[in-house]
Swiss-Prot record:
Domain Calpain catalytic: 55-354
Signal peptide limits: none
Keyword rRNA processing part of the UniProt annotation: no
Keywords: Calcium, Cytoplasmic vesicle, Hydrolase, Metal-binding, Protease, Repeat, Thiol protease
Name of the featured protein: Calpain-11
Amino acid sequence: MLNYSDISWAEKGMVATINHSRLKDKGVGQHQNAYNYKNQNYEDLRAECLRKGELFEDPFFPAEPRSIGVKNLGPNSEHMQNIYWQRPKDIIHNPQFITNDFSPTDICQGILGDCWLLAAIGSLTTCPKLLYRVVPRNQSFKKNYAGIFHFQLWQFGHWLNVVVDDRLPTRNNKLVFVHASHRQDFWSALLEKAYAKLIGSYGALSGGSTLEGLEDFTGGVAQCIPLQKPPGNMLRLLKKALEKSSLMGCSIEVTDNSEVETMTHNMLVRGHAYAVTGLEDVYYRDKLETLIRIQNPWGRVEWNGAWSDKATEWEEVSPDVRVQLLHKKDDGDFWMSYEDFMSNFTLLEICNLTPDALNTWDYKSRWHSTFYEGSWRRGSTAGGCRNHPETFWSNPQFKISLPEVDDPEDDSEKNEMVCTCLVALMQKNWRHAREGPQLLTIGFVIFSVPKEFQNLRDIHLKKDFFLKYRDHGFSEIFINSREVNSHLRLPPGEYVIIPSTYEPHKDADFLLRVFTEKHSETWLLDDANRFEHLQEETVTDKDLDKDSLQLFKIMANEDGEVDMYALHKLLNRMTAKLRNFKTKGFSLEVCRRMINLLDKDGSGKLELHEFQVLWKKIKKWTEIFKECDEDRSGNLNSYEMRLAIEKAGIKMNNRVTEVVVARYSDNMIVDFDSFLNCFLRLKAMFAFFLSMDTKKTGSICLDINQWLQITMWG
């Protein structure tokens, strides 16, 4: 019996991609139906440990130096001396998983440079409903304790259930990484371990952004807004974000490390993460004043300017408003005017939540969201940015329809007919290769779809389209970041989004997410795999010149037929005489495929009429090859191969194109023999499929015997 371990890595990747797509269609990967990371089922593993009376030890993230990291966190580094892995019960007498009085100030950073993760975890504590989506309840060091815990983390479009054992790195009986200030709670330390397992090691956590952590804890889309150059609809954007229960943070950026944790004259802390939690309009001195509520999660130091707890402005508003909004406590919560907010803080960060994160909440409105997973593959779908027009068209393409305009703005004199759209492009798995490849420079371009291309789906726009039409919008900049996004306001209509790397020929996987205020439709814009039945060639005696006819008779056997070997010699002599065409000749494999294509009686040979048909086809294929060989090099590049195969009658979608290029190109170069080998293989596979799909359903059912016969023959 064939074992999965016997299958090559390339085949495993293809099988994994197909299986992943099938599971996604069944709803696996949503929060309520998360993937079991590393195929580890928490309930099953815990039950097995309880049955055996053992404590769980995770084989995929062992209590070994390699789980901590390399270089500065390697086993020989200064930081990692005298490190021991201990379970919480070995550290303190009565450990708790999580208590009800958690707050951001309970979480302390260790020796690891992951303050960004610390801030994201702290933000979760301000929103218990989100926290308990990540940290499932009913976990304990007492009832059914087996040394195993689990967490739910979002990664690149899918929720994962990540299992860890509770062995944690310690020195002198104290945790060396994230820990609780009062030492009793261990949920934050174990959550950090689950995140480290997901990306490979603790060391891979060094360096990041708070928004990256918030995205992986919520599945939301994050955006940064510099407040020195805010968008024109800044106040509306804030109101909409709060209506949609978005998580928001603000800060005063620093340019020098010496400024971190220093205070302004109004008691705001530089380099400090604040939360934006509310927005209210109050009547003050006969006009409407917009106030913003800010929370300092890390301490009790508060703003002491206008509208602070003890400010005189509160004496001039109605008593009802004062009672409703003002709470004179040093609890980190305070109000300030919108103008003071804009002039004192320099950065606003927003994490827009997906509808599934809000499904049990009270909210006024929510985003409509869709996401697509895709890839850029060298030689097929990695076309680079618009600076590379010869290959830009080959990038994945996505169409979005925006039929409904936003609701009118209450505070605006002119109500534009626009659709708000948040587009976010994220590259996958960059932390997993932290010691190797780094982040690629990525971005996207948006084109308005002209009328003649609207309502089309089974099409991949080619080079001519992008040379003719201008883009309608674009990401702020192509940047080497995990994610780039743009908050756009577009007229109703259809648009095409082209995500790409800046340079062509860069391999990567990506996630494209689109958030809209109103209903929208999005879909992948791609060719359907299709075989066009071209008109069969009619041949006459004039299609072969006298020399070629004589050569056939010399090569043929007594029955007037040529086999694969004779055809090989015959074709190589004849193609050598073709004018303005370079070729190294045909391989035996291609000759075998040609015979399979035209051999009607199953003899494995071709008689004269069949050869005449073949020769006419070959001349047509050579013309297609020359037409697509734009630089007249005698070869096609892998992008031209897709166009040539299409001209020959076969359309391929991006996934099939990626496989074909990987199989039949040599460093993105395709000679005539490889082109024909690929085309004939595709044509044979289409013929087999269509003959089996008698009801034209687009799918067939094969047993192992039929599968092996067809694939081995093809």
